[in-house]
């Protein structure tokens, strides 16, 4: 009997101990909780330090702003604070165009930005100033060029006058000093006369311009006016000469692609004229229409759709307008050429020469536009 009682009381005591362990409250936290508490306390302390630094920085900025405001008020000029200059964006005034029923067209680019200008480089001649009427966006560029030419002429005259004074012997210095003003006036008149192109030079320049205009982009004879010692005449010669490099390159490309049996041809329609070359699924060379047709329909383009010329859209009207504008400018130049060539020598000679230079630059711009429209 005693053995049975002992065996029955053992499981009851084990269950009571297990319940006591479960119900006993945990006095000490585990190691994970301790580490978490340490991390939280560390991050809170770091955040508080950063907040203190930010507060200190804001106080310094406010002090600087107040000092700037006080100094600007005392001097009578309002200057923006550095915080406002950093935060406030710049307001750009935009002009709102009136709403109209007309269709807005994209502005046509006259010349590509990467294309090189056919005119020569005058950087060595004009103290680093590049004179290019095709790429000149500033409308006052011509006036700047003319002012630089005038300054260089005055400097040359001054140097010549100093050299003439140094070359004179000492015994004749008194007579030279007495006659200096008259000699200076005479030398200035002679230099102005030498700078102004004569009637024969103007006629030669007119012949070169007429030959260039009649050719319309073809190769012309390189006839230039006689050489002169003045820099203005050199600029006129450089501007008046046709852009032979661009014309020769375009003619060379045309002759290469015209009758060359080894030229690139489309493997589908056998054409050699296209705006861009592409590759089909097999890697063969195809023209732009055949490549786009295959990409869209996944089928080869029928040969019946072949056109041995590049389609031109809205080109004829623009070409006629540009050619008419070029003829008007050329006629105006022809009418104004005799008056500018035979103008006043003593007072208005330099002004007439500069007007001639400006007219020549306008004519070259018009002809470049006409040549660019003809290549489309």
Swiss-Prot record:
What Gene Ontology cellular-component terms does the record carry? nucleus
> Which SUPFAM superfamilies does the entry mention?
Glucocorticoid receptor-like (DNA-binding domain)
The name under which this protein is listed is: Putative transcription factor egl-18
Tell me where on the tree of life, at the top rank, the source sits: Eukaryota
Where does it live in the cell? Nucleus
Q: Does the keyword Zinc-finger apply?
A: yes
Q: What does this protein do?
A: Probable transcription factor. Involved in embryonic development and in vulval development in larvae, acting redundantly, at least in part, with elt-6. Perhaps acting together with elt-6, may form a positive feedback loop to initiate and maintain lin-39 gene expression to ensure proper vulval precursor cell (VPC) fate specification. Together with elt-6, acts as a downstream target of the Wnt/beta-catenin asymmetry pathway, required to adopt or maintain the seam cell fate.
């Amino acid at each position: 009997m005693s053995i049975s009682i002992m065996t029955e009381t053992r499981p009851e005591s084990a269950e009571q101990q297990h319940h006591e362990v479960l119900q006993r409250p945990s006095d000490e936290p585990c190691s994970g909780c301790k580490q978490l508490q340490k991390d939280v306390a560390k991050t809170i302390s770091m955040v508080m330090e950063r907040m203190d630094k930010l507060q200190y920085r804001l106080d310094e900025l406010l002090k600087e702003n107040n000092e700037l405001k006080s100094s600007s008020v005392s001097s009578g000029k309002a200057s923006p604070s550095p915080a406002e200059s950093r935060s406030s964006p710049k307001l750009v005034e935009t002009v709102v165009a009136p709403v109209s029923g007309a269709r807005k067209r994209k502005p046509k680019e006259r010349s590509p930005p990467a294309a090189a200008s056919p005119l020569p480089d005058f950087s060595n001649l004009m103290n680093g100033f590049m004179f290019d009427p095709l790429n000149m966006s500033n409308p006052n560029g011509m006036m700047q060029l003319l002012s630089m030419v005038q300054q260089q002429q005055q400097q040359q005259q001054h140097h010549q006058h100093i050299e003439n004074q140094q070359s004179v012997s000492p015994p004749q210095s008194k007579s030279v000093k007495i006659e200096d003003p008259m000699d200076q006036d005479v030398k200035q008149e002679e230099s102005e006369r030498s700078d102004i192109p004569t009637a024969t030079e103007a006629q030669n320049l007119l012949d070169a311009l007429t030959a260039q205009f009649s050719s319309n982009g073809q190769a012309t004879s390189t006839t230039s006016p006689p050489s002169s010692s003045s820099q203005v005449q050199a600029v006129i010669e450089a501007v008046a000469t046709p852009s032979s490099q661009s014309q020769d390159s375009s003619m060379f490309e045309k002759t290469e692609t015209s009758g060359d049996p080894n030229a690139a041809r489309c493997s589908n329609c056998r054409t050699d004229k296209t705006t861009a070359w592409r590759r089909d699924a097999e890697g063969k060379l195809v023209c732009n229409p055949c490549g786009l047709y295959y990409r869209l329909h996944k089928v080869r383009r029928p040969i019946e759709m072949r056109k041995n010329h590049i389609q031109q859209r809205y080109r004829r009207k623009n070409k006629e307008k540009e050619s008419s504008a070029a003829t008007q400018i050329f006629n105006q130049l022809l009418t104004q050429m005799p008056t500018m060539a035979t103008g006043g020598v003593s007072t208005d000679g330099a002004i007439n020469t500069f007007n001639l230079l400006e007219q020549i630059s306008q004519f070259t711009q018009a002809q470049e536009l006409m040549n660019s429209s003809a290549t489309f």
